[in-house]
Amino acid sequence: MRVCYTYFQTLIECGMMRCAINEGERLLKLSEGDSLGVRYQLMHLYAYTEDEMHALALHQKYGGYEETQMLLPLAILYYKQNQFDKAKDYLNRLAKVNRDTKKFMRLEAKHDGYSLRMEQGMYGYRPGTIEELVDAYLNSTYLFNATPYFSQWAYQYLRTQTASKKKKPKNEE
C-alpha cells in the first residue's frame, strides 16, 4: 500500500494529474478506511481539474463531513468555475470548522511562505487549526499555484464578513 501511495505522490509531483487521479481512486478501492489521507489529495486533484461531479461524490462517500481538507478544495473548485456564491458558501463553512481560515488566507495572499511554514506543526497537525490549512497547502501547492488570486479573493470576502458581523447591533432584551 505504501509503495502505491509513493507512486501516487510521485505522479502528482511530476504533474501527471489524470494518472494520479486514477491511482488515487484505485488506492481508495484498496483501502476504504483511507489511513493515508488519499481522499484529501484526491479532493485537491478534483478541484485542480475542475471535476465537480467526482469531488461532490467523494465528499458524500466520506459522510459529507465538514472537514477543512474537503471544504477548502471545494471552495477553490467553485472559484475556478466562476460560481462565487457557492465558493463563498464553502468558505463560510470552512471558517466555521477552522477558526484560522482568515489568518491562513491573509498569509497565503501575501505569499508569506516563511510565516506559513512557521505555523506548520512539527508532528503533523491539529484539526481545525492553521496547521491543518498549512498541511493542505503544502501537500497541494499545485492547486494554489493554479489559482494565484483565490487567497486574496477569499481573504477579502472573509474580512468583509467579519466587518459586517461587528457592525450588526446586538438584540437587546
Where are these regions (language model features)?
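Solenoid-like repeat scaffolds
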Residues: E25-E32, L58-T68, N92-T101
